[in-house]
Amino acid sequence: MYVIDHDRAGGYWGAVYVFTAIKGLQVVIDGPVGCENLPATAVLHYTDALPPHELPIVVTGLGEEELGREGTEGAMKRAHSVLDPDLPAVVVTGSIAEMIGGGVTPEGTTIQRFLPRTIDEDQWQCANRAMFWLWSEYGLRKIPQRTPFEQRPAGEKPRVNIIGPSYGTFNMPSDLAEIRRLVEGIGAEVNMVFPLGSHLADVQKLVDADVNVCMYREFGRMLCEALERPYLQAPIGMHSTTAFLRELGRLLNLDPEPFIEREKHTTLKPIWDLWRSVTQDFFGTANFGIVAGETYARGVRHFLEDELGLPCNFAVARKAGEKTDNESVRELVHTKTPLVLFGSYNERMYLAETTSGHGPKPAYIPASFPGAIIRRHTGTPFMGYAGATYLVQEFCNALFDALFNILPLGTELDRIDATPSRRGDSRPWDDEAQQVLRDYVARQPVLVQISAAKQLRDRAEREAGAAGEERVTASRVRQLLGQKEPA
């Protein structure tokens, strides 16, 4: 399949983002000169706001000699000479180094090797393996059983690991802050956030948790399975979060109901207020679409469509190990254009191609990488109760934007041609032209169908009159809509 507009990176990026997220581990990239500039310097500046050279990375800087004749071992020794000999190090290979058998660790060094398989695996598949690799290399060989709750000292809180936060993950700080808030809200404590913020010396402490929360569907589950503890998927949506808290409370021997009740009157209150406000008239007809990683695509669609009843035009999930058919995504955006589109820079481009036409300008809400968008502040969650409120709030703001784009500017009204006076009757329409008009209006959100119909009808009659045509034909209407004539 020919893939346009890639929506994820190769495995080498996933390994780098996981290994650099954990403290105490030096990373050697075995690749050509400058191979770290894109993933570790440029992209992380536009996604995680990291300054250049923030991460503990050394590059072998392969040249023509190494690639064509000498191999990578000599370059590896040079890279090793600038490392701190007292700290562990891991070498990851880019696709070029993999093709020539690179990544071989020189004898007498403490560098360990991790093979990203960047030719075969994508960013999420490799991140999944990299997290497990950290545990398999620096964790415990035998996992002890946790002490039963009734045998623990009074007042000792149960513990939870949050698995998944790493670099290059959309909206991670806000979602992490919300999951931490939920865990602590029902009376538990966060044992470790892994790998981001953890130290290599503390990897063994992952077994000190009673439950693991896997933040993402794309990666992290391999480690959760290896830790031999119950694990839950981080929730998106109001009812999903309630179910998550109740199951977490059951596993931790805690009562989550007091916290849930407080949340209804605090964090969740804006949802009720928005639901009962003037925007309630639009909720049943304002459609949306989403193209994002599987975590967000599944969660946001379930929340907005199943829990709230908003009409969904399409939901496309980007899954680990599967290539997204972006050509069909582009077609969906063009033919089933929603009033609100959640997506990445790719979908924003496809949406920009549909700017001509009538009715409102669709609103775009970032929900995925790729794209240059920094979310270091913790006030934009999609997960948990705070995420449910944020999503409804942003959806309402998108509706206001749509209304803004429907209303004409006064300066535009002053610039248009005067409205020609009508004869006794309007210009007649062919039956086929009427059908094209009806089909077009039916595809518009109910919110703007009357406006769209009037705009198209007036323009078709005006241009037909200017061309000296006695009737409005289907060809004239299709021309205005940018549609091709049927074969």
From Swiss-Prot:
The lineage of its organism: Bacteria, Pseudomonadati, Pseudomonadota, Betaproteobacteria, Burkholderiales. NCBIfam families: BchZ (TIGR02014). CDD domains: Chlide_reductase_Z (cd01982). Residues 460-487 are annotated as: Disordered. Converts chlorophylls (Chl) into bacteriochlorophylls (BChl) by reducing ring B of the tetrapyrrole. Belongs to the ChlB/BchB/BchZ family. Its EC number is 1.3.7.15. Keywords: Bacteriochlorophyll biosynthesis, Chlorophyll biosynthesis, Oxidoreductase, Photosynthesis. Residues 460-473 have a biased composition (Basic and acidic residues). InterPro entries: BchZ (IPR010244), ChlB/BchB/BchZ (IPR050152), LI-POR_suB-like_C (IPR013580), Nase/OxRdtase_comp1 (IPR000510), Protochlorophyllide_Rdtase (IPR016209). One of its GO terms (molecular function) is oxidoreductase activity, acting on iron-sulfur proteins as donors. It catalyses: 3-deacetyl-3-vinylbacteriochlorophyllide a + 2 oxidized [2Fe-2S]-[ferredoxin] + ADP + phosphate = chlorophyllide a + 2 reduced [2Fe-2S]-[ferredoxin] + ATP + H2O + H(+); bacteriochlorophyllide a + 2 oxidized [2Fe-2S]-[ferredoxin] + ADP + phosphate = 3-acetyl-3-devinylchlorophyllide a + 2 reduced [2Fe-2S]-[ferredoxin] + ATP + H2O + H(+); 3-deacetyl-3-(1-hydroxyethyl)bacteriochlorophyllide a + 2 oxidized [2Fe-2S]-[ferredoxin] + ADP + phosphate = 3-devinyl-3-(1-hydroxyethyl)chlorophyllide a + 2 reduced [2Fe-2S]-[ferredoxin] + ATP + H2O + H(+). This is Chlorophyllide reductase subunit Z. The gene is bchZ. Chlorophyllide reductase is composed of three subunits; BchX, BchY and BchZ. Forms a heterodimer of one BchY and one BchZ subunit. It comes from the Bacteria. It is an enzyme of class 1 (oxidoreductase). GO terms for biological process: bacteriochlorophyll biosynthetic process; photosynthesis.
